């Protein structure tokens, strides 16, 4: 596929009311790389609910990043088309061959995990374990399809009103053992990135998702990521050299088994971490143990 190095005015899709067969509603996210809108099929009434989201390239993105933005959009589309699992967001439509480039997914009625952590006064331990286990199920489904997520972070965990998790953020994903191009300017992502990912010769590996999920679980319990660096270089140094504060010290209500699991997941050497299957099995076991536990985690 020949990728354009810049977007024409006709491809600056954030100014359009209609893209392909989709009518755009309100913009819900405006990021450096992409804009995301509520959407509905243009064949239905303009007053119909916008039960879908459409993701398009930010028209203000510098021309030298357009090819990479299309590649990332394609990675997300290919991953969410192939991974059929209830905790992975589904692809409904996409255009990757010509402008305007886009993908369409269901609208999840609920909130992301990062919003939940910032707004809720507390979270029940049993519900938290349910959310974490579902997230792990989504990541494992990617692994079973030969794909490493490489973008695990609380903003990519959507929690529907029923409590069902939908894992998004697959634009960072790579095939297992594929050389990666992880962006070097994403500070938020770097807070959860495994130390080996910073190497120039890094190839995508499931062990990196083990670390990132461990970092996210740490954040859920400690209300902050394992490391507080203010630059990517600071975070790289921390991931490579520093040991995070003990979870039990920060959050005394954390189950001992969960704190121990997270500690193992955050081991610097990827070969010494538990396998993702071992992580998931332990999360399931902990979830069952605390299924009726009334403990509330203060947020």
Where do the language-model regions lie?
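Structural helix C-cap motif within protein kinase domains
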Residues: 222-226
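Activation segment signature within eukaryotic-like protein kinase domains
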Residues: 131-132
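Protein kinase catalytic-loop region centered on the HRD/HxD motif
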Residues: 137-147
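Activation-segment/catalytic-loop signature of the eukaryotic protein kinase fold
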Residues: 94
């Amino acid at each position: 596929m020949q990728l354009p190095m810049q977007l024409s005015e006709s491809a600056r899709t954030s100014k359009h009311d209609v893209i392909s067969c989709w009518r755009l509603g309100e913009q819900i996210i405006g990021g450096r790389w992409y804009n995301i809108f509520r959407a509905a099929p243009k064949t239905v009434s303009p007053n119909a609910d916008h039960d879908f989201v459409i993701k398009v390239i930010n028209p203000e993105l510098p021309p030298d990043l357009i090819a990479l933005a299309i590649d990332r959009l394609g990675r997300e589309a290919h991953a969410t088309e192939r991974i059929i699992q209830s905790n992975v967001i589904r692809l409904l439509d996409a255009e990757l061959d010509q402008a305007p480039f886009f993908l369409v997914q269901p609208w999840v009625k609920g909130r992301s995990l990062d919003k939940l952590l910032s707004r809720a006064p507390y979270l029940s331990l049993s519900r938290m374990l349910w959310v974490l286990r579902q997230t792990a199920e989504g990541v494992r489904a990617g692994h079973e399809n030969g794909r490493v997520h490489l973008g695990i972070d609380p903003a990519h965990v959507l929690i529907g009103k029923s409590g069902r998790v939908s894992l998004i953020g697959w634009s960072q994903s790579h095939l297992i053992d594929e050389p990666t191009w992880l962006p070097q300017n994403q500070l938020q992502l770097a807070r959860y990135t495994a130390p080996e990912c910073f190497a120039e010769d890094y190839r995508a590996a499931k062990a990196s998702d083990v670390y990132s999920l461990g970092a996210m679980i740490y954040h859920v319990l400690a209300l902050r990521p394992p490391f507080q660096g203010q630059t990517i270089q600071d975070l790289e140094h921390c991931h490579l050299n520093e040991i995070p504060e003990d979870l039990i010290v920060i959050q005394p209500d954390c189950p001992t088994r969960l704190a121990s699991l997270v500690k193992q997941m955050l081991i610097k050497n990827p070969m010494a971490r538990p396998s993702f299957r071992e992580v998931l099995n332990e999360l399931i076991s902990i979830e069952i143990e605390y299924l009726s536990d009334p403990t509330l985690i203060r947020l």
